[in-house]
Design a protein with these regions (language model features):
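Class I S-adenosylmethionine-dependent transferase superfamily signal
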Residues: 39, 109, 131-135
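Conserved Class I SAM-dependent methyltransferase catalytic core
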Residues: 122-186
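C-terminal beta-strand of the catalytic ATP-binding
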Residues: 96, 185-188
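Conserved SAM/SAH cofactor-binding pocket of Class I
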Residues: 1-92, 97-103
Length: 189
């Protein structure tokens, strides 16, 4: 099973366990909203919040949600800025490309994606560090976090998440066999 199929089953199972309550999902650094909107379309018993610092990205996400008839909440802010409450899941595809690598990217990436969406600062991990540090304040007990990561960031993500107290930290490979998704669970102590 690939990660998308596994996650669809997981969101539906989480919804079943919450009975009539909606599963609360935060898509942080949402960009076009494709991750959060896809979750909403696959599992209707979710309450999806899409958050991004870019007004332009949120405009695209809003259009995508409208075109797909997906009911979502949009919030503009820098990471957790303006986010209230706790979530069952935090999903994030933050900028993760090291600054010095961006110039060497394929033209279809570097010339068509805003630098804001790509630049993960010096080592590509800056946004992960910030999100991992703050995420426990926004996760329900046993809340889960999912990150899209760069192909060579798996070991660093395991260390960062484990050091912050996440359990069951795993890195999942994509169809090419490269590290692509890092996941973990945060339990209240």
């Amino acid at each position: 099973r690939n990660v998308k199929t596994k996650n669809r089953c997981e969101f539906n199972n989480a919804a079943d366990q919450k009975n009539e309550q909606k599963v609360k999902v935060l898509d942080l650094c949402t960009g076009s909203g494709c991750i959060g909107i896809s979750v909403k379309k696959l599992c209707q018993n979710t309450e999806i919040t899409l958050a991004d610092i870019s007004e332009g990205a949120l405009s695209v996400a809003k259009k995508n949600a409208e075109n797909l008839n997906a009911s979502v909440t949009l919030i503009r802010g820098n990471l957790f800025e303006n986010i209230e409450g706790r979530f069952d899941y935090i999903l994030s595809n933050p900028p993760y490309i090291p600054s010095q690598v961006i110039q060497g990217l394929m033209p279809e990436v570097k010339d068509h994606e805003p630098r804001l969406a790509l630049d993960g600062e010096e080592d590509g991990l800056a946004f992960y560090r910030k999100i991992i540090e703050q995420a426990p304040d926004y996760l329900n007990s046993n809340g889960r976090i999912y990150f899209e990561i760069g192909a060579e960031q798996g070991e660093d993500m395991i260390r960062l998440m484990t050091d912050r107290g996440f359990s069951e930290v795993k890195v999942h490979k994509d169809l090419a066999g490269l590290d692509r998704i890092a996941t973990g669970i945060y339990s209240r102590r």
